């Protein structure tokens, strides 16, 4: 095998400087605005499938474009450019029926990139390198594409190996310098790619070139899509010998830092990092500027984290050039010496390190058809669900590796092994640990290796069939990246005595390390634990032989480990489990002291050595060390005595109703059982000796119970729905006590003239949804959780004026005020409340929460208006931490110091330049000076252009408005998107169980999610059957024409203009020929002729009746039910909007009559046309709702607008319908002053937004403040 000189060349450069890899190819291709014919060219002009979007084809059909993009990146400073082959496998190309072109795609892509590198290299005198990009494909080995069949896979390991091998071979033939296996979301796929590449180098004689490997961490959980941590990913793929490893895609640089840092500490290779240009915005675009991204990556470089940096989605040559400049002169990271030298690394979803500090690794033994009759029967009967429970019990009992054996004559071993391993891969609590694939059939071992993404242990190979077969199998195991168990077995048979055991192990070790190239730390010797106490004298020393052989192996074979099947030692005592378990414990005690560091053992059934009865311990040690020839007989007698005595059954049952009243109340609170709480509370109250006052019942047994609830919730052992149910129990108990407490208070006042103002609470919180906003689900949850944690909550409801909030805070002597809001105008109202709190002299902390709020807005806009604590609370649990910290005088100062430093850091990063005075700050950000805006006139010149001569508007089936009253909810159920429902309850699944219904499989929240979902189904049926809610809607279609940035709508009968929807145009700097979008771009212009295009309008609600119904529930202290009803109403409203849009497309407007989309497709927006809402990214101005309401007469359907233009009922949706097939969602983003204020350009009037609407500039700025990109007074 020949090795390229590039290894040394790149290593030398990496010692001198940080290298640069290019940015996004797809982003740059999109900017070329290519059409179908560009992708087809001549070669595919008659192809049977649409090809637009198959970017890899452009290397064949438009190589000029690809060359241009490569050259732009190289001229920007890139050392490496990636070939245009992200989807260049037969598997990915199958979607386009282009499998036959895979060689040409990869070969030509490599040639184009090679030419660009050579040209720029010649011009600059600096050599540039081509990375052959190998993407992940659109299939995964670790995750089933079918929810119903978790063991199903739509691709095999060998199919991926073949596809990756073909791609890599063609890339190398085209002249790439490096192979880059990138965007790895499933380590099993990466292992297939690396397997294919190593096969090319080691078996086909292809000269070896460097390999880079880059994974993708999908979110802040720090895991890949298939669930592995970054460190586990490194362990799983180390056999591919990459010279650089790192991360790309999914995250922006700032969020990627901690994961890159972890990799940097773990890996002795180069580290590469090419993140996205920030996180996607609401419409999937990327907003991070080149300067912002470069500054973050500069910090990576200064901290010694990286050797190669670049960009992924949303990055451009400008980003790469900024990075190139940012790291000039900064020394590259120096890779550390192997941080895990002398240790064995394994992985499941998480890494596992086996070294001296681990002492002993338990290998769970019960998933073995040869060793467990129950497990065998489960597998034979295809009862895999219960079989997985066996695995789960092993892990819960302490197994650190899971042994899986499917060797039974009546089983299809490869099938059973693959199916079981695939099933447990979707069980995070099991899959977190490595697997030991245990079989005497090498085909079963291969099946297992190809069904798991982690680094496994293979159990086993041996010299039984000679050295050649041994080496062949060892090389295969090594290429799959597994560690290996080697049996003390050779051509002469199984070793029993110490010397023979060591002789075979030493010979095997030499072959593996010297001839096969195995890492010594990945070698595990099974020195044969054989059965003692068989009655045969020659077996009596088997225990001692193993222990002595273990000592010799560990002393003479560096790095090697020793393992064995512990239960073999006690096989003579089958049926006497107590004796066997004790024998295993004694054997392990001595074997571990000799150096045995792993063992197949039932981890949950080992007694502690020192807990074994001394007479029994003496007998077992005599037997193990063959010190008493009568030991076997004596042990049998002892076993019979133990059997005669038997074991007392544990008859403990769940009889909580027979416990003390205090324990009953605590149990009811934790479990959320309200059936007996009033009676139990009354029983406690009547015990006046123990609880002289009703308040004492709250302070002691009830608060003791809620303290347990709070602890469990804080530790993540209880979930929000359970907490709310606990609160329901607490509220009922307190409601029962309140009349007695009031009576007591009144009696004290009358008898002694006292004004008792005692409180059992930590503090009082006044909480409200601010004026103009009607959304309260999140606020209600916060109120409940605070109440559960011993805070008195005064809930002022929704649409609460500032003066009412302040008045309530003063009257209630509140310790905190909490403000909530969902819509953007609520942010300004929160600022107003903060100002007023300061004006009237309040000094209590202000808590800010709600979907539209953020820490940045709180720190920059709200906190400076109020010189006392202002805290942004991300969710309900955060509010508890904040209130508790601020209530505890021992931690309050430290908490506030941290908070102030954090907010000051936020303000500094936002480039806040000066304070106006002690309480107020200037809202001028230096960063806004650097923001690149395009003049309004120029943006209009670069509008999104549609060839209107080729577009014939479809006339709707009716013109004017049509109402849909009392709509049948049953028709909406299939359109419900359940993910936001679980978000309401703060139930968020993790890899790969984020979405519905996969969330039910999540190890942490799945059970609770299923319970809440089942409750929702019950409530949904109740709401529908009892006609609690009403769903109304109104839809209107009107003739329309665009004029500049605005859309006029017309009376269908007279042709007179009815009104105008005013539009905002994107104004942030854009590169090359990117369009600046405005909604008016999607409507035929007026200047073309009479209006013959159309605009749709709609408003719908599913919340009529919800507020009244929930009020009754809340009066009955059932917050859980109230939140449930509101959450369901919200989901039904969104479902109604989705249903209406489909009806519009297919029937009412009928511009997409042949649409064949599933509910999933609808939720993924795979249809023609859009329905943007006023106040959202494509038109951020909420005031446009006034025009919409006037034209729709929406009030007739029971939907009204509040003062701040929120919709009431809150469970309502509204917007516009656009039918143009080229219409698309976009975000207006920040706008400059020339789009807001009236100006003149060269005597030509450029009409601005305020002038067109005939509204004062200040009012426009107030409504558009979130997108204003200049300094406001």
Curated annotation (Swiss-Prot):
Residues holding methylcob(III)alamin: 699, 772-776, 820, 824, 876
One of the record's GO molecular function terms: methionine synthase activity
EC code: 2.1.1.13
Keyword Repeat on entry: yes
EC class of the enzyme, as a word: transferase
Catalytic activity, reaction form: (6S)-5-methyl-5,6,7,8-tetrahydrofolate + L-homocysteine = (6S)-5,6,7,8-tetrahydrofolate + L-methionine
Domain spans labelled B12-binding N-terminal: 652-749
Pathway where it operates: Amino-acid biosynthesis; L-methionine biosynthesis via de novo pathway; L-methionine from L-homocysteine (MetH route): step 1/1
Domain Pterin-binding as annotated: residue spans: 360-621
Residues in Hcy-binding domain copies: 7-327
Cofactor(s) the protein requires to work: methylcob(III)alamin; Zn(2+)
An example Gene Ontology biological process: methionine biosynthetic process
Gene3D superfamilies according to UniProt: Cobalamin-binding domain, Cobalamin-dependent Methionine Synthase, domain 2, Dihydropteroate synthase-like, Homocysteine-binding-like domain, Methionine synthase domain, Vitamin B12-dependent methionine synthase, activation domain
Occurrences of domain AdoMet activation (ranges): 927-1273
B12-binding domain location: 762-897
Annotated Zn(2+) binding sites: 249, 312-313
InterPro entries: Cbl-bd_cap, Cobalamin-bd, Cobalamin-bd_sf, Dihydropteroate_synth-like_sf, HCY_dom, HCY_dom_sf, Met_Synthase/Corrinoid, Met_synthase_B12-bd
CDD domains (UniProt xref): methionine_synthase_B12_BD, MeTr
PROSITE patterns according to UniProt: ADOMET_ACTIVATION (PS50974), B12_BINDING (PS51332), B12_BINDING_NTER (PS51337), HCY (PS50970), PTERIN_BINDING (PS50972)
Function as written in the Swiss-Prot or TrEMBL entry: Catalyzes the transfer of a methyl group from methyl-cobalamin to homocysteine, yielding enzyme-bound cob(I)alamin and methionine. Subsequently, remethylates the cofactor using methyltetrahydrofolate.
Recorded family membership: Belongs to the vitamin-B12 dependent methionine synthase family.
Name by which UniProt lists this protein: Probable methionine synthase
Organism: Caenorhabditis briggsae
Lineage: Eukaryota, Metazoa, Ecdysozoa, Nematoda, Chromadorea
């Amino acid at each position: 095998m020949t090795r390229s000189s590039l290894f040394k060349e790149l290593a030398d450069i990496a010692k001198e400087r940080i290298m640069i890899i290019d940015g996004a190819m797809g982003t740059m291709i999109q900017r070329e605005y290519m059409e179908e014919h560009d992708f087809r060219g001549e070669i595919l002009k008659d192809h049977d499938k649409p090809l637009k979007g198959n970017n890899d084809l452009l290397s064949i059909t438009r190589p000029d474009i690809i060359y241009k993009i490569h050259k732009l990146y190289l001229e920007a400073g890139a050392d490496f450019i990636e070939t245009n082959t992200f989807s260049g496998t037969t598997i990915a190309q199958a979607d386009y029926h282009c499998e036959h072109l895979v060689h040409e795609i990869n070969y030509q892509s490599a040639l184009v990139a090679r030419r660009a590198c050579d040209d720029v290299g010649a011009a600059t005198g600096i050599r540039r390198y081509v990375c052959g990009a190998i993407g992940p494909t659109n299939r995964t080995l670790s995750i089933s594409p079918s929810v119903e069949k978790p063991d199903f896979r739509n691709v095999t390991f060998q199919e991926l190996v073949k596809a990756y091998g073909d791609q890599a071979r063609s890339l190398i033939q085209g002249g790439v310098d490096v192979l880059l296996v990138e965007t790895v979301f499933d380590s099993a796929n990466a292992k297939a790619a690396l397997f294919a590449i190593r096969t090319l180098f080691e078996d086909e004689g292809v000269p070896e070139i460097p390999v880079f490997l880059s994974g993708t961490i999908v979110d802040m959980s720090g895991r890949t899509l298939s669930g592995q941590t970054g460190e586990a990913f490194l362990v799983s793929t180390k056999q591919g010998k990459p010279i650089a490893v790192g991360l790309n895609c999914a995250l922006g640089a700032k969020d990627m830092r901690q994961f890159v840092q972890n990799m940097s500490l773990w890996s002795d290779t180069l580290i590469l990092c090419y993140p996205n240009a920030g996180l996607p915005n609401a419409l999937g675009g990327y907003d991070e500027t080149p300067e912002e991204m470069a500054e973050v990556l500069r910090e990576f470089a200064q901290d010694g984290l990286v050797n190669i940096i670049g960009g992924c989605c949303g990055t451009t040559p400008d980003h790469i050039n900024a990075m190139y400049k940012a790291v000039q002169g900064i020394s590259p990271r120096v890779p550390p010496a192997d941080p895990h030298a002398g240790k064995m690394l394994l992985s499941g979803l998480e890494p596992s390190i086996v070294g001296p500090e681990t002492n002993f690794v338990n290998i769970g033994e019960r998933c073995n058809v040869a060793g467990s009759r129950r497990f065998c029967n489960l597998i034979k009967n295809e009862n895999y669900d219960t079989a997985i429970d066996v695995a789960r019990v092993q892990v819960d009992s302490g197994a650190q590796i899971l042994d899986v054996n499917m060797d039974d004559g009546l089983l299809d071993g490869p099938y059973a092994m693959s199916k079981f391993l695939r099933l447990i891969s979707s069980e995070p609590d099991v899959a977190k640990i490595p697997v030991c694939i245990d079989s005497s059939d090498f085909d079963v071992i291969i099946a297992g290796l190809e069904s798991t993404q982690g680094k496994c242990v293979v159990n086993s190979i041996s010299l039984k069939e000679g050295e050649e077969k041994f080496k062949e199998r060892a090389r295969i195991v090594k290429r799959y990246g597994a560690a290996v168990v080697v049996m003390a077995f050779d051509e002469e048979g199984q070793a029993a005595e110490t010397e023979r055991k060591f002789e075979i192990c030493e010979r095997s070790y030499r072959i593996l390390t010297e001839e096969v190239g195995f890492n010594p730390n990945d070698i595990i010797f099974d020195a044969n634990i054989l059965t003692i106490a068989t009655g045969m004298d020659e077996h009596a020393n088997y225990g001692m032989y193993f222990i002595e052989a273990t000592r010799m192996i560990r002393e003479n074979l560096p790095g090697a480990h020793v393992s064995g099947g512990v239960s073999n030692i006690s096989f003579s005592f089958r049926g006497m489990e107590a004796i066997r378990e004790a024998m295993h414990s004694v054997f392990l005690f001595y074997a571990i002291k000799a150096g045995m560091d792993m063992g197949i053992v039932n981890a949950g059934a080992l007694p502690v050595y020192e807990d074994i009865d001394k007479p029994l311990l003496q007998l077992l040690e005599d037997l193990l060390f063959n010190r008493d020839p009568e030991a076997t007989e004596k042990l049998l007698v002892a076993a019979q005595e133990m059997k005669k005595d038997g074991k007392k059954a544990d008859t403990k049952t769940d009889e909580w109703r027979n416990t003390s009243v205090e324990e009953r109340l605590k149990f009811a609170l934790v479990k959320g059982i309200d059936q007996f709480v009033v009676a139990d509370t009354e029983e406690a109250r009547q015990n006046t000796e123990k609880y002289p006052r009703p308040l004492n019942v709250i302070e002691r047994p009830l608060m003791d119970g809620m303290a347990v609830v709070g602890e469990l919730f804080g530790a993540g052992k209880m979930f929000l729905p359970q907490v709310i149910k606990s609160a329901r129990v607490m509220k009922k108990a307190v409601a029962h006590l309140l009349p007695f407490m009031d009576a007591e208070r009144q009696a004290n006042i009358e008898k002694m003239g006292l004004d008792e103002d005692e409180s059992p609470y930590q503090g009082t919180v006044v909480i409200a949804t601010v004026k103009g906003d009607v959304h309260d689900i999140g606020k209600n949850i916060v109120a409940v959780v605070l109440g559960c944690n011993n805070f008195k909550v005064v809930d002022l409801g929704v649409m609460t004026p500032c003066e009412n909030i302040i008045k309530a805070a003063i009257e209630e002597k509140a310790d905190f005020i909490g403000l909530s809001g969902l819509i953007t105008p609520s942010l300004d109202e929160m600022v107003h409340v903060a100002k007023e709190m300061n004006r009237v002299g309040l000094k209590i902390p202000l808590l800010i929460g709600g979907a539209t709020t953020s820490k940045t807005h709180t720190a920059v806009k709200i906190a400076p208006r109020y010189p006392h604590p202002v805290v942004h609370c991300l969710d309900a649990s955060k509010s508890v931490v904040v209130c508790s910290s601020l209530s505890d005088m021992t931690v309050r100062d430290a908490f506030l110091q941290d908070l102030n430093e954090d907010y000051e850091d936020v303000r500094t990063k936002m480039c806040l330049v000066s304070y106006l005075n002690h309480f107020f700050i200037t809202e001028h950000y230096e960063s806004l000076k650097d923001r690149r805006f395009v003049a309004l006139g120029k943006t209009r010149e670069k509008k999104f252009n549609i060839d209107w001569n080729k577009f014939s508007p479809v006339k709707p089936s009716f013109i004017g408005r049509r109402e849909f009253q009392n709509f049948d909810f049953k028709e909406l159920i299939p359109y419900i998107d359940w993910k936001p429902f679980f978000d309401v309850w703060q139930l968020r699944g993790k890899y790969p169980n984020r979405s519905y219904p996969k969330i039910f499989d999540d190890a942490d929240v799945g059970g609770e999610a299923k319970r809440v979902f089942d409750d929702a189904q019950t409530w949904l049926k109740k709401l529908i059957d009892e006609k609690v809610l009403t769903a109304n809607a109104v839809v209107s279609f009107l003739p329309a024409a665009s004029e500049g940035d605005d859309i006029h709508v017309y009376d269908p009968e007279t042709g007179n203009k009815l009104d105008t929807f005013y539009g905002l145009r994107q104004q942030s700097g854009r590169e090359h020929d990117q369009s600046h979008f405005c909604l008016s771009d999607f409507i035929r212009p007026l200047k073309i002729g009479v209006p013959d295009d159309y605009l749709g309008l709609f408003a719908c609600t599913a919340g009529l009746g919800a507020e009244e119904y929930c009020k009754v529930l809340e009066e009955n202290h059932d917050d859980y039910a109230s939140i449930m009803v509101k959450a369901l109403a919200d989901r039904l409203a969104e479902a109604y909007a989705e249903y209406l849009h489909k009806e519009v497309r297919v029937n009412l407007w009928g511009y997409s009559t042949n649409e064949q989309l599933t509910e999933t497709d609808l939720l993924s927006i795979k249809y023609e046309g859009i329905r943007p809402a006023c106040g959202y990214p494509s038109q951020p101005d909420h005031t446009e709702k006034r025009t919409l309401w006037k034209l729709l007469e929406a009030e007739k359907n029971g939907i009204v607008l509040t003062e701040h233009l929120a919709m009431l009922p809150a469970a309502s949706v509204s917007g516009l319908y656009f039918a143009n097939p080229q219409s698309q969602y976009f975000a207006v983003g920040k706008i400059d002053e020339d789009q807001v204020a009236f100006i003149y350009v060269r005597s030509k009037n450029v009409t601005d937004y305020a002038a067109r609407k005939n509204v004062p500039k200040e009012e426009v700025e107030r409504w558009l403040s979130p997108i204003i990109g200049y300094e406001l007074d």
